[in-house]
Design a protein with these regions (language model features):
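Flexible loop/turn segments at secondary-structure boundaries
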Residues: 16-21, 127, 182-183, 226-230, ...
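Short, hydrophobic beta-strand segments
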Residues: 84-90, 185-192, 238
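A short glycine-rich, hydrophobically flanked beta-strand micro-motif that places a catalytic Asp/Glu
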Residues: 121-124, 176-177, 218-226
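ATP/Mg2+-dependent ligation/transfer catalytic cores
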Residues: 1-175, 197
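Short, conserved phosphate-binding/catalytic loop or strand-edge motifs used
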Residues: 123, 179-187
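Glycine-rich anion/phosphate-binding loop at the beta-strand->alpha-helix junction
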Residues: 196, 201, 205-271
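Accessory "access/gating" subregions that flank catalytic or transport cores
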Residues: 151-155, 159-162, 167-173, 187-192, ...
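Metal-centered catalytic cores of metalloenzymes
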Residues: 177-181, 194-197
Length: 271
């Protein structure tokens, strides 16, 4: 797609904290890209900043450029707004700290060895509702259970709203269900090439949180937002496709079905 059917373009990129940072651009100016301060990579969750190497913090907090392919602009979840994931550069070179740069380098390394990384992501999150003191409390869904569905697990239809919005926008949702604790849900997207999968999950999370906010709730993917409840997982399912399109992790001739490459990958993770 291009910019013609949109009033504004929302250019987003993931930072080192997995926060969706970006800017809105008038559609007529979108092809120029945009700029952001490189030193945002020195921020912590508490907004404290320090002289982190590579962030330009002590060099005047310089700008970096955000570029994107106009053909990758897609319908957003706000009226009249298209959305796209951008790449970060400085002086014509990729920003080393940018997560998309790190992932692209890893994908390129596997490609040079003759493999294509394929990834599937399972997300877990809690829905929170406002409490009388201005904070947040667990979503009141006493009928919820692991693998729960329907109104008993989600009385206000938060997941239904996310699912309907996601399908309308072209997200390839594989499944949604209640998870272990009250107000906890699992959302899974279909398997894909590593970069596309990461971009899809990044945008899906942003969309899901904002759809929940529109309904007056907070959707959080924090590892353990409620100390008394179980934590949220993030499951990364990885395989490698060889030049013939086969799963290079699979070897049916072995007792466990794993190839030598798969065992080497597991050993590397453990190391």
């Amino acid at each position: 797609m291009g910019t013609e059917e949109y009033r504004r373009i929302r250019v987003l990129w993931p930072d080192h904290l997995n926060l969706a940072r970006g800017k809105y651009l008038p559609a007529r100016l979108a092809e120029r890209g945009t700029r952001h301060c490189l030193s945002v990579f020195s921020l912590g969750y508490d907004r404290d900043m320090g002289p982190t190497p590579g962030t330009g913090f002590l060099e005047g907090m310089p700008d970096m450029e955000c570029h994107f392919d106009v053909s990758e602009i897609r319908p957003g979840w706000e009226d009249g707004v298209g959305v796209v994931v951008g790449d970060l550069e400085r002086n014509g070179k990729p920003v080393p700290l940018a997560p998309r740069t790190v992932l692209r380098n890893a994908v390129d390394a596997w490609t040079q060895m003759g493999f294509k990384p394929k990834v599937g992501i399972e997300l877990e999150a809690y829905v929170m509702e406002p409490d009388p003191n201005g904070g947040w409390r667990p979503y009141n869904a006493p009928g919820s259970m692991v693998y729960g569905t329907g109104i008993r697990s989600d009385p206000e239809g938060i997941m239904q709203a996310i699912d309907e919005t996601g399908e309308r926008l072209g997200f390839r949702i594989e499944s949604m269900n209640g998870e272990f604790d009250m107000g906890q849900f699992e959302m899974t997207l279909e398997f894909d090439d590593a970069m596309r999968c990461a971009d899809e999950v990044f945008l899906f999370r942003a969309m899901a949180m904002e759809v929940a906010a529109q309904k007056g709730h907070l959707l959080t993917f924090m590892p353990r937002p409620i100390p008394e409840f179980g934590g949220n997982g993030l499951h990364v399912n990885l395989s490698l496709e060889d030049s013939s399109g086969n799963n290079a992790m699979l070897d049916p001739s072995t007792p466990d079905g794993l190839s030598a490459l798969a065992k080497s990958c597991i050993a590397g993770q453990l190391h």
